[in-house]
Amino acid sequence: MAEPFLSEYQHQPQTSNCTGAAAVQEELNPERPPGAEERVPEEDSRWQSRAFPQLGGRPGPEGEGSLESQPPPLQTQACPESSCLREGEKGQNGDDSSAGGDFPPPAEVEPTPEAELLAQPCHDSEASKLGAPAAGGEEEWGQQQRQLGKKKHRRRPSKKKRHWKPYYKLTWEEKKKFDEKQSLRASRIRAEMFAKGQPVAPYNTTQFLMDDHDQEEPDLKTGLYSKRAAAKSDDTSDDDFMEEGGEEDGGSDGMGGDGSEFLQRDFSETYERYHTESLQNMSKQELIKEYLELEKCLSRMEDENNRLRLESKRLGGDDARVRELELELDRLRAENLQLLTENELHRQQERAPLSKFGD
């Protein structure tokens, strides 16, 4: 019975030497009791070979061989030439594995070339899929793994790299140097553009803002001394001039006439703006009330003005006395100026002999 089994086994199609390694392998357990059937899932078509009927077993319900008479699974590793076949045939042709068949024990079978090909080791197994090398390429594979494990060389930053610093963190000296450098660069670029005939825009700087800011406040002390000195007559004395100069300079704020006018104008503008805003925010009743208050204030000021006019008329006789005092003051100033000129002449005459004696 071994010869028909081997002949049918040899006629099965062979795709490669590793077809048996890809399928699920399972060795027969020698301790399994005889006659035990191996249950195979019906859903998996790989385990049901309908194209090739089973040999050496009883016919099934559909005319095929029973599950007991399946050929032994192929081994993934190399087996001896005759031991694999004998172990696979034990469950089918042995006396203790067949339930109802009276088959004699198989005779010794000579190894065929097909059986030797099936018994060769598989080189395309999972080990080769994971990248395991063959026996001859172990060194090359190890070298590739070492190269992959090496870290890439990372270049260090250049030591000559300029560290940038924000402008607001610079010191005063650093800001000054930076501004000078930028101005020189802008001037150079403008000169190059002008030489090429291209239109040149003015240097973009904020200095004009500072100039406008400085011009907002008037020059309070420019030309005050010369104008006041030219307006003074020759009959004034040095003491009177110093006193008048102190009055012209203003109070403790040190601002002259132009400064006081500027402050007065600024105050009036601010007051008008505030008054306008307050009137716009008032309701109609509040505006009527404010108008009545202003009329009362106007009538009161008119009464005060009339009273002061009457008093000035009563004191009209004192105006002549005031004029006489003003004339007397002018005469005394003229005498004082004459005395000053005479004193200066006497000093010059006293210095002349001393200069001759020194020579």
Swiss-Prot record:
Domain notes: The coiled-coil domain mediates oligomerization.
Summary of the tissues where the protein is detected: Ubiquitously expressed with higher expression in placenta. HEXIM1 and HEXIM2 are differentially expressed. Expressed in endocrine tissues.
Region (Disordered): 1-163, 213-262
Annotated segments matching region Autoinhibitory acidic region: 210-250
Chain intervals for the UniProt region annotation (Mediates interaction with CCNT1): 286-314
Comp. bias (Polar residues): 9-19
Subcellular location per the Swiss-Prot or TrEMBL entry: Nucleus; Cytoplasm
Anything else known: Inhibits Tat activity which is required for HIV-1 transcription.
UniProt organism field: Homo sapiens
Gene3D superfamilies linked to this entry: 6.10.250.2910
Residue segments, region Required for inhibition of ESR1-dependent transcription: 310-355
CC terms in the record's Gene Ontology section: 7SK snRNP; cytoplasm; intracellular membrane-bounded organelle; nucleoplasm; nucleus
Name the record gives this protein: Protein HEXIM1
Location, primary (coarse class): nucleus
